[in-house]
C-alpha cells in the first residue's frame, strides 16, 4: 500500500523524518507530532468522506472489516509497517485516525547520552544491568519513547551470544542478535499469554515483551523469576513505583491474589521516561531491592545524573 494513496499531505508527513505521528481529529483537522516541537496542527482540513475512505482502504489492504458494527480498526500499514488506528461513527462524531511511524534507526545508549536524554552514569548502569542479566521494565506515558529505549537495550543484548525471544502484538522492536525469534499475537487466534507460555519451550535465554498490557503479566513474571533472567518489557505507568502497581493491576485480571514478592523478585530495574519529542528524558531509574510490610523497596540515590560511575563495577557497588 503506497503512502500516496492517503493523499499528498499525509504522504509528505510520513516522509518527513522529524514526524513521528500523524493524527486526524473528527473536526477534520490534521495534526502531526514532531520530534523537535511536539504536536502541532498542519493547517490541512480533511473531509469526513476522505477520512473514511482512508480507513476503509487500510482495512481492505489488511483484509479486515470496519463499519458501524465494528467501528475500530487497528492495523499495520502494509510494506512500510506504520501502526494505524482508525475509528468510525458511532464511537466518534466523524472518522478519525492516528498513524504512528516506526523508528528509522536504532538509537543506542550512546545516542541517548549525546542527545541529553540520559546521563553517562545512567547509560553505564543500564549496560551493566543488561550484562548482568537483570530484568528491566521500561515505563512511561504515551509517546514517551518506551519502545525506542527498549530497542536501545536490545542493541546491547545483541552484543551477547544469548538467544532472544521477542513477543509483540504490533511489530515495533528491532533486534540485531544473530539468534532471535520474533513472535506476534493475533486477535482471536493467539494471545500474548499464549506466546509467553510457548516461549518457555523454545529455549530462550532472554524473554522480551513489547508491551505488557494484560494477563500475560503473570506468565512473564513467572518466566523471569524461574530461570529466564535478562528480559525487557515496557508498560504504561506514571513512575517507577507506578510500573509495579501496574503489574499488580494486570495480574489481577487472572488472579485474585497479587504475588507482590514475585513482582519484586522478577522485576529488577525500572526505567521511567517522561516528556515527548526533544523533551524526552530518563526521569528515574529504580533498582527493585525487595518487598516488605512497607511495600516495594526501591533504590534511586545511586543512579542520579550527577553520579560518576566506576568503570569496573556498577554504580553504588564497592569492591
Task: List the model feature ranges, each with a label.
Residues 16, 33, 39-132:
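P-loop NTP-binding catalytic core
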Residues 123, 133-136, 152-266, 272-274:
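Switch/coupling sub-region of P-loop NTPases
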Residues 146:
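Conserved lysine of the Walker
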Residues 264-319:
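Conserved P-loop NTPase
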Residues 5-12, 58-77, 162, 254-260:
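Active-site phosphate-binding and catalytic loops of NTP-dependent enzymes
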Residues 1-41:
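N-terminal anchoring/assembly modules that precede and organize ATP-driven motor systems
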